[in-house]
Amino acid sequence: MLNDRAQRLLKTLVERYIADGQPVGSRTLTQLSGLDISPASVRNVMAELEDMGLVASPHTSAGRVPTARGYRVFVDKLLTMHPLEQQALRQVESGIHPDSPLRMAAAASQLLSDLTHFAGVVITPQRADAAFRQIEFLRLSEKRILLILVTPLGDVQNHLLVTDRDYTPGELIETANYLNHHYAGQSLEHITRDLEQELASLQGHIARLMTAAIHASKEATSQDDIVVSGEKRLLSVEELSSDLASLRRLFDMFEHKTELLHLLNISRQAQGVSLFIGEESGLSPLDGCTVVTAPYTFDGTRVGTLGVVGPTRMNYERVIPIVDITARLVSSALSSPLSGSDAPSSH
């Protein structure tokens, strides 16, 4: 446990280092902390904090800098949160409005990057347990059918079905009507379980087409995707750009996305804002970074995650409320009756 004096000095050191990026010396800490304490006493406290792994001494400086563990203590116990400034709040409110979910994800990602000057990341709202609002079939040619799936979020998804026989327009309409009447609004997992029991009693052409449609829909909605914006802004962050090998690994991760998707899916289960500082992410490309995330919801169900990837030396006091408010506004916009109303027609 840190005593009050050690906490005050650690808080002062982290805030100063975030502000200017320079190692903080004992004399500066004495002046800024407001404590009635000598530089020698400050040095003793700094030595204790260093032994605890909360601060470190760069070889080229007599001052100290916070470690990832030091940032964690700062964020969990010492951070003073303030309301987001009005200009940034207005920018978030004007940038997030009811739209197709995919366009909204792209807008949120860009907005997060613009406001923080780091990389904005958003998982698009596609879930394996997703439902559909409406299904249509369109005959393209013999044995080739276009499945048009409208999700509850308003996205229109097109999937090509290659069938074992030709279907008449009447058969396609009959199958679509059956699915829409019996299963609209139900999860694909629930539909799959029901179909296993019902297929035997259905006409063969309906059963085969329904099976193909649900399989294609599940395959598509189980594939989460991630939108990354502004990653090139990290090139101007000295702590990251000074190590080219680490920077290359970071950009490889942005390009291939699998590891980042896994991390964001973990944070989807959290309540409110989550932070992964340095090695806490378990991903070596992020060892010098902090990832700040928050889940967003549709009708009370968490359907995606958004956040910011930046250096560990970031203005947590500002970034955390930006991520939190953006997630809340995306959730609100997704639940708006206007959401998805201008999704492009598939016909």
Curated annotation (Swiss-Prot):
MF (Gene Ontology): DNA binding
Keyword ATP-binding applies: no
Stored InterPro entries: GAF-like_dom_sf, HrcA, HrcA_C, WH-like_DNA-bd_sf, WH_DNA-bd_sf, WHTH_HrcA_DNA-bd, WHTH_transcript_rep_HrcA_IDD
The entry's keywords: Repressor, Stress response, Transcription, Transcription regulation
Keyword Transferase assigned: no
Superkingdom of origin: Bacteria
One GO-annotated biological process of the protein: negative regulation of DNA-templated transcription
Coiled coil feature spans: none
Similarity comment: Belongs to the HrcA family.
Job of this protein: Negative regulator of class I heat shock genes (grpE-dnaK-dnaJ and groELS operons). Prevents heat-shock induction of these operons.
Protein name in UniProt: Heat-inducible transcription repressor HrcA
Organism per entry: Laribacter hongkongensis (strain HLHK9)
Taxonomy of the source species: Bacteria, Pseudomonadati, Pseudomonadota, Betaproteobacteria, Neisseriales
